Regions:
Chain A
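Catalytic-core regions of core metabolic enzymes
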Residues: 2-705
Length: 705, 705
């Protein structure tokens, strides 16, 4: 019976995607094909042949009649059939004309390997714009320029449209990388680890087809099980967020962004040209969209090995089986560090193990089957852990002790691994130059057991599987839309200035945020009047558009207790600032709360970042702050409170009372709504906000528009 | 001319060391030799033969006349010649007798592979003590029991006294590991990286010959260039510190201590038995003695590769040469993260590079010679960096672009590397399954260039070389001996109690530490009298031996401004505590300083730890504290101040004044002297000490003896 679901799958499989001519070309023209060995125009053809490309190759060369044994044509117009994809490997100045030709010929996708465009200054930018205009006119999609190309390792295509030198076997990991150099060594690393690859894309200047578009394409590709992504920044971060949100929960995206130090970012700028948009926000984008972020490319590749064969664990509870002590200690350290737990075994499990293990074995978690333990001992431990309800994943340390039948151990691991019920990760310690152990390794490898050479590396890989489980189950929810906002509020256009305090407080009040009671006084008498209205003690702050860091300049007087002190403070400020427009902000003084900060930083091409942390002088001293990309949901705001280092302070310590966390969480969300409503806000600091047991009140704030 | 120095070296080389019979045995008896394949008593003989052991092998077996083709003897007494070393592979209960036999035969070193001793409870402990007594009586040194053994890869010996399966080629790295499993995979990892090994030792229960003793032996071995050490704790940390101090500045010691999480420590306890002594102090021991600490065993092995061939850089300034963009960005990030700097190139260097590099090259630091750059381009960049005064080391990213003569590039790198003037680390990105690139790799390998597969891994290795340079040049100096101490001070024996405040303050004063002026009052009148003497405002604290956490219990009244308030406070405390022996500590109230903490924790078998950090409630909330192992020198005390996260606070921020750091540094040193003078001090907290611009004063303190 054909069900609705199966129809959909069939439809999906037959659906033609715009990028199919790029990733699944039935025919490829190489414009700039060359008979010169080691030239890119020759290497690309050589690679297609070497990789057994299943489609047709059309070398385009004005003079040669054949290249590498394949008939060549003077121009694409001389090719008698349709062409899906063209490689362009000619000097940059000829590219606009060639793109027009491709359009006329009906070629849908073009990989421009040639350099000499936006990465080379004005002249190059003009050329890039010229060929892009032609591409738009004719509906040609451009991959590159200044790029490597793509690879599709699916045997149906074997499309090696690239000049690199690694020939991966087919698999389920797809790679997209901004840098060809990094993409290539990631591909090589998978190859060295004997992990198959699905697709590869390295798009250089990325003037048309973006990383985001490739990411979505991989997301829709049924053969792609996990994705590796490398970038140094995003030209269009919003587009990326959209794409990542679609894909990241369905398939693990393992990503690395370099240029995380100032020096690294400089090095990045020097080779990719200016990448507009985000820098520090990239990690926040990864977090928000559920991308697994790595800052070590080797860890990323090693984790990919686990994703390529293992199921995702249901939780963070791991059982360890080991036949050697020290490596289990190292593994335990790392497993715990990445958030996994080692629950004790059930009495039932202990009873079974006591009957089945050697007398020297240690029954517990880890289970030490000892070096003399054989296949049956590993098997009973594996079976026990597979049946333990409290265990979500299995970590194995397997050293090939010379006095055991290691093949038998491997066969038992493989049999249990085939069930695919819980992920199994194996730290396999052996000497592969010994034939006997090569056999053991092959049994594990063929049985789909991911094998690592170090306990820490293996533990990190299991940590990555668990992290993806958290990504899949984490639901940040939708940002709350507060409806008690004063909708009459309007803000002037951004002009790079700070708003007067009175405006700032009005804006906060309009958004339902508590502000310490305040008035603006023009003179001493008004200041005394207002102080009485507000109730002592008060704070007095000098107000003039030129004053920003008031407290550093002596423009703030705190804890004013009576009219006499008001007069003194006002007189002193008058004397100090001698400013015609000087006014005086009289505000309720609120000592004894915990000083916190909520801040906002606008981002080019991206939503503003919201910051929360310890306020007052501790902002600078401790930098104990957390950023999130807005809009911030309630769950995210809660996470901000619990992730600062001083989060204990909010709960109250040593007799001190805690704060009203709910009110802080609400302020963060209201600020998030405010800055999303008014994109002209460039910068905002509520510092400090005073958090009390019952409520939280803003006592100082500034807004730059 | 034979100088004094050269005589010493000759003497040293000929000197006979007690452990020579263990590491350089001329003859080995295998007591428990077996003809059974895969048994340890057979594998050890097989390994000795396979590794071409240069000495004589004497299998000892009551029944067999030969084992693996070698004449066997019923007992060691039947062996006609002297024996240097014996392997003991017999049931534990026979071991005491065999050790006595060994003693009688004049065997100086014994490796006990057999298990069944201290790791197996009381009976085992008794057996271990029994054979140890015999060993002492006859002057036999014991390695093990429950251990693997040793390996000496020096071709003069080829002594493979171990049952493992990795056969390293000779080299300059020596390994000592508590866990045989970890030792074995470290050895295997060096083998996989094609790094030679010098010596190997894994001593299991370590009942006699300790890791410390082996470490000293490696330190004196001229062929050992660097040492890898793995442990899960120390039985005798003082002995280890002595050994490490002797060796760590001469030769890099790369070390890893596992069991750093609670769960990991538990796992360690379950397989090594209880290791008395330190746990959290291990990192501090490593720091104090100059050991390079790793928490990732792969990083440690990769770093060893750099140490095995490269000189130590003179400083932290690195020049990068790359022929691909992205990997240079990744490398830059990591290099900067581990403390290296990328200085700009001199004008002279830039001029040379402009003349010698391709037009597409990026001239700067990194120098991007681009993928089409060949041998001459790499060479000119290398020569320039070798001659730059501001560059201490060279990092190379070398991808084997198919369109360049990669052998020529490799040859140029090797020629410059042979100079050994500055360390060269190479991230070599290639496909070793391609013959052409295998040749390139061999050129680099034979030329002693350490090659890595990932930029981050390579950068970490260079970071380790730099770290050793810091170790070699760091001189913490000797602990200062303050002579203005009141030498009449005495302390009772430790009894697990807290000293009364009056005693605590007297002790601090005796050690020249400023304490806020104080008196002990018996009643209200005395309290008022003393408050007047001290000067208001004061603090009043309830004093009785039963009161420890006074402030939590309402036993502290601060900011008392006059006699009336004194009376009120005293009356309230009387009512609250209803304690016959209740007294009242009247002390100067000192608001406005920065609250800091200095603390002490005693360690079993080791000097106490000194702690410094943010005081008051921030101790618990932020845990912004630094520990050092006492005695703490002036430099170390300075490091403590500069390494807390809030160190900026001490310098003063946003108009706030800084503190008198010198006075804090002195307090730390005086406390260090105090606890070294009085080992009965179990615990001490000066919390808070109030730091002002001019001085630092202790306002509260407790001491447990």
């Amino acid at each position: 019976m054909i069900t609705q679901a199966s129809i959909q799958i069939i439809d999906n499989a037959n659906m033609v995607h715009e990028l199919d001519t790029l990733f699944k070309p039935k025919s490829i023209a190489i414009i700039g094909a060359s008979s010169k060995e080691l030239s890119i125009g020759n290497v690309v053809i050589k690679n297609l042949i070497h990789y057994n490309y299943t489609g047709k190759i059309y070398p385009i060369n004005l003079k040669e009649s054949e290249i590498r044994g394949i008939k060549a044509y003077p121009t694409i117009f001389d090719v008698p059939e349709d062409i899906d994809l063209a490689h362009v490997i000619i000097p940059s100045k000829f590219v606009p004309q060639i793109i027009e030709d491709c359009g006329k010929k009906g070629i849908k996708s073009v990989i421009i390997n040639s350099a000499g465009f936006s990465e080379m200054g004005e002249e190059g930018i003009a050329l890039q714009e010229a060929f892009l205009a032609k591409a738009k006119e004719y509906g040609v999609r451009i991959f590159g320029p200044n790029c490597q190309g793509i690879i599709n390792a699916n045997p149906e295509y074997n499309a090696y449209c690239d000049f690199t030198f690694t020939f991966p076997k087919p698999g389920s990991i797809s790679i997209v990388a901004l840098s060809g150099g990094v993409g290539a060594f990631i591909m090589q690393s998978l190859f060295d680890l004997d992990i198959g690859m699905r697709m590869y894309a390295s798009n250089g200047n990325a003037c048309d087809i973006s990383i985001s578009e490739v990411l979505k394409y991989y997301g829709e590709d049924e053969g792609t099980k996990a994705i590796i992504l490398y970038t140094e920044g995003f030209r269009n971060p919003r587009e990326f967020i959209e794409a990542a949100k679609l894909v990241a929960k369905k398939k693990p995206i393992l990503a690395m962004k370099s240029g995380r130090t100032e020096e690294g970012a400089q090095a990045a700028a020097s080779h990719t040209g200016s990448l507009a948009g985000v820098d520090i926000a990239t990690e926040l984008i990864f977090e928000k969209t559920g991308i697994l972020s790595f800052n070590n490319e080797e860890d990323m590749c090693q984790a990919a090995m686990a994703f390529s064969t293992q199921p995702i664990p249901k939780g963070n509870r791991v059982g360890i089986i080991t036949n050697t002590g020290g490596p289990a200690v190292i593994a335990t350290d790392e497993l715990v560090s990445v958030g996994l737990q080692l629950p004790p075994l059930s009495q039932k499990a202990i009873n079974i193990l006591k009957e089945t293990q050697l007398p020297e074995a240690t029954i517990g978690n880890p289970i030490d089957v000892v070096a003399t333990g054989g296949g049956i001992h590993f098997r009973s431990a594996l079976d026990v852990l597979m049946n333990e309800e409290n265990i979500d994943s299995i970590f194995i340390n397997f050293v090939t002790a010379p006095f055991t039948d290691t093949d038998e151990v491997a066969r038992n691991i493989v049999e249990v691994n085939r069930l695919k019920r819980k992920p199994i990760i194996c730290n396999f310690m052996t000497n592969l130059s010994i034939d006997r152990f090569q056999t053991t390794a092959k049994i594990l490898k063929d049985g789909g057991v991911p094998c690592y050479s170090f306990p820490t590396t293996a533990a990190k890989a299991l940590g990555a599987l668990y992290k993806f489980q958290k990504v899949q189950t984490r639901n940040i929810g939708e940002p709350k839309k507060f409806t008690d906002i004063d909708s009459s509020l309007s803000l002037p256009k951004g002009n790079g200035t700070f708003l007067p305090s009175s405006d700032v407080f009005k804006i906060l009040s309009a958004y339902g945020i508590l502000v310490a009671d305040w008035r603006i006084a023009k003179n001493t008498d008004e200041a005394i009047l207002y102080a009485n209205e507000i109730g002592f003690p008060v704070v007095i702050k000098a107000e003039a558009s030129s004053l920003v860091h008031k407290s550093d300049l002596g423009g703030v007087a705190i804890n004013i207790k009576n009219a006499g002190e008001v007069k003194l403070a006002v007189d002193r400020m008058k004397l100090k600032f001698k400013n015609e427009e000087l006014k005086f902000l009289v505000q309720k003084f609120l000592p004894g709360g915990k000083e916190l900060i909520v801040g906002v930083t606008a981002q080019k091409e991206l939503e503003p970042l919201i910051m929360f942390g310890l306020g007052g002088i501790y902002v600078e001293v401790l930098k104990d702050v957390i950023f999130k990309l807005s809009p911030v949901t309630e769950l995210e705001a809660e996470e901000m409170l619990s992730s600062i280092k001083a989060s204990k302070l909010l709960d109250g310590v040593r007799g001190q009372s805690g704060v009203n966390k709910k009110s802080i969480i609400e302020i963060i969300q209201r600020i998030s709504q405010l800055v999303n409503d008014f994109p002209q806000i460039k910068e905002m600091d509520l510092n400090p906000i005073m958090a009390f047991e019952d409520k939280t009140i803003v006592v100082d704030a500034r807004i730059k528009i």
